[in-house]
């Protein structure tokens, strides 16, 4: 069980997150949707402490952090429990795809090279990159780099996987491979929080959808409830151009 309570964040005196509360069951995929500037990516960056929240707590099983009193040791523990896939990939340019995935396994998980290689190969295969494992990032397409980043995060087996636009750089024919990898990971008990503007991806993958408006969670429910039967007028307006696809 993951519980996020009263998460707040201000930039230049303006609240971008205002008392965010999210409860997530183990293995659940939660999608954050809304207009640009609603606070979706800020939530992910705050949870991973890449942005310092002004207040709030996160509880992961028996590990609880208060962001107002968080220690350096707690930050390190939190980042071991949360893995994040960024829009910008953040790969090591002078290391192969395989080595990019192996790195965290050897440094953080303290695995041997053979153990790390085995896991890295398995995760790259899941995202369709077995034939690219010895390629350097400069020889990979944007979509392939995104899948290496996803494989690297999944390889760490985090308590919570944070995904910021995981399909944004993928060719349409490759989106299904990533969706399957995410769905397979969820079935194995991988909890995820997803930010995406790809509503088809959200509808197919998410168990729960949270619609954000100006730093608030305006409405939440199943994909069908939010897409096809929203209660709030602003939610209805936002999904008006999408909902007919999912009736």
Q: What is each residue range found by the language model?
A:
Residues 202-204:
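A short, surface-exposed alpha-helical micro-motif characterized by mixed small hydrophobic
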Residues 135, 156, 188:
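Conserved signature/switch motifs of ABC ATPase nucleotide-binding domains
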Residues 161-164:
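Catalytic Walker B motif of ABC-type/P-loop ATPase nucleotide-binding domains
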Residues 65-83, 187, 229-230:
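ABC ATPase NBD coupling module
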Residues 48:
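Helix-to-loop junction immediately C-terminal to a conserved catalytic motif
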Residues 136-140, 144:
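Conserved ABC ATPase signature
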């Amino acid at each position: 069980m993951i519980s996020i309570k009263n998460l707040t964040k201000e930039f230049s005196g303006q609240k971008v997150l205002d008392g965010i509360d999210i409860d997530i069951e183990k293995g659940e995929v939660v999608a954050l949707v809304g207009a640009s500037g609603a606070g979706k990516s800020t939530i992910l960056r705050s949870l991973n402490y890449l942005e310092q929240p002004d207040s709030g707590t996160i509880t992961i099983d028996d590990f609880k952090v208060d962001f107002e009193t968080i220690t350096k040791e707690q930050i390190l523990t939190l980042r071991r429990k949360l893995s994040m896939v960024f829009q910008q990939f953040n790969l090591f340019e002078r290391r192969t795809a395989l080595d990019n995935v192996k790195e965290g396994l050897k440094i953080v998980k303290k695995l041997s090279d053979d153990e790390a290689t085995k896991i890295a190969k398995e995760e790259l295969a899941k995202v369709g990159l077995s034939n690219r494992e010895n390629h350097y990032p400069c020889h990979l397409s944007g979509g392939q780099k995104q899948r290496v980043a996803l494989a690297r995060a999944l390889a760490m087996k985090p308590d919570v996987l944070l995904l910021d636009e995981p399909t944004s750089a993928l060719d349409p024919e490759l989106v299904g491979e990533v969706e399957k990898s995410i769905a397979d990971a969820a079935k194995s008990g991988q909890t995820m929080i997803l930010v995406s503007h790809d509503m088809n991806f959200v509808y197919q993958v998410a168990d729960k959808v949270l619609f954000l408006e100006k730093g608030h969670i305006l409405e939440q429910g199943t994909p069908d409830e939010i897409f096809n039967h929203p209660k709030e007028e602003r939610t209805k307006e936002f999904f008006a151009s999408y909902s007919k696809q999912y009736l």
